[in-house]
Amino acid sequence: MHEKKNTAKRRSALRIMGSLIGLVKPLLHIMMAAIILGTMGYLCAIFLTILAGQVIVHGLLTGAAGTSLSVQNMWLVHTPVKTILTVMIVIAVLRGILHYAEQYCNHFIAFKLLAIIRHKVFAALRKLCPAKLEGRDKGNLISIITTDIELLEVFYAHTISPIAIAALTSLIMVCFIGRYHVLTGLLALTAYLTVSVVIPMWNGKRGSQKGMEFRTGFGELNSFVLDSLRGLDETIQYGQGEKRKEQMSGRSKELTSVQENLSRMEGSQRSVTNMVILLASFGMLALTIYLYTKGGIGFEGVLTCTIAMMGSFGPVVALSSLSNNLNQTLASGERVLSLLEEAPLVEEIPGDAASGGDHAFAGAEAQNVTFAYEDETILDQYSLKLEPGKITGIHGASGSGKSTILKLLMRFWDVQTGRVSVDGADVREIPTKYLRDMESYVTQETHLFHDSIANNIAIAKPGATREEIMEAAKKASIHDFIMTLPNGYDTEVGELGDTLSGGEKQRIGIARAFLHDASMILLDEPTSNLDSLNEGIILKSLKESAEEKTIVLVSHRVSTMNVADVVYEMENGRIS
């Protein structure tokens, strides 16, 4: 199957941010604390410079006899300089404490939420698999789970509270500067809005597409590297190393080109921001001097408004700078949200067990089943009856639909028409957990985790004793081999079980099925990688277990069918 390309309409930045902010709800009280602490911290930094200006005015008024300075709103005129300096020291210390506390709260929220999001993503993947994940680009999924989620730290630690802090601080400063004259307040408001809203929106609009291109390209590069590592032996064997190297170099250059474009946008945005700050600062100076000459404000207003304007851009500059990284962050957020919101093809049925209590397993049946992968019909009006206590063989060539019927019995997919029932009930009505407990499924390719052999077998039964694991391994004809290893059952199998042969991995998979001890065992080509001796041992174990279990044996080998009580021949999705 081929992965479908995502043709869904892109979300707006505000919609992405709204969805991400919605996840903060459990930690809203900490977010409010971060906003208050951050606002107070910035105000401390701003008023530190304003107080310094007041000291200058104070000195001019008290130490420059004969000066003709006009003072209208000198709020610290009667305060001793020593007191002002003491307040400045206290404010400077508070600034550091408040900034630390704000950052602590923000990062606590960020890392707590990243853990929650990872949990949600893995839960979503579990619901989507295998129907929605078969054929999906695994490198891109890894990129979403790792780097995309990690990038959300920028949003939660350095975006949400800075937006609120910038808004609150700007509002307070507009009121403070505006108390000298309405025009100074309007100029401050215009400058803050330009730096914190207009410039980021302009930069975000032109860079959002590039941000998504970079995150998608990064995921595709991850897939390519992963694919190259897995196929390293074949690459070397067929002399494709140079070609693979050129392909990787080409992909890296494309990604670098996108990153350079983003960097250029970042540079131009910084330049525009700095230009606006300079224009606003000198504009405030010019405006206050003009108002001073007209008697609109006093000299302290000229100095205080200019200093306040120059020193109060910190919160809005921080907000403006966010848009540089925000393009990639929001692209990552969109990819994560799309995965979380993707609807599974098969909805899980809640519950732990079917009603009716303990009873004898009633077998399984497929009745007039039609099933297709997208537009390719695999099963057409297919019927099959699996008697309890019997071994049923399904024989046919590759691509005839043998494996598909096992996946439908496991309810990895739902049928388009017809009915699949297990233990007398439609699989679409059986609680998913109970269905999984009733069935053991051994696939053609056994996946082994980077762990010990014992733990790989014990996946089928958490908490299994070593004796139970060994008994299952004996039935799967793998026990003797395991005992020849230096560490026996504690031997690490390596990544993807690369230290073991295909046949050894397959037998460990069969050992899992024996350990799971389910009422029905589904075996997809269980002996394809085995020699005739080991095939005979495993088939003998299956025959001995058949009286108490329902076994479905899928294979293209005629010899494997010899152990079956009933054999169905499959051809093009039909019984022949």
Regions found by a protein language model. Give the residues of each.
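Membrane-integrated ABC transporters
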Residues: M1-A45, G63-V81, E102-N106, A110, ...
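Cytosolic ends of transmembrane helices, especially the final helix of ABC transmembrane type-1 domains
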Residues: Q237-Q240, R264, C305, S312-E341
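Transmembrane helix-loop-helix hairpins at lipid-water interfaces of multipass membrane proteins
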Residues: M31-L98, G178-L183, F299
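Juxtamembrane helix-loop junctions of ABC transporter transmembrane domains
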Residues: A13, A45-G53, V57, V87-E134, ...
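An intracellular "coupling" helix at the cytosolic face of ABC transporter transmembrane type-1 domains
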Residues: G22-H29, K127-A131, T147-Y156, I160, ...
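Hydrophobic alpha-helical segments in the permease module
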Residues: I84-R95, H99, Y192-T194, E266-A280, ...
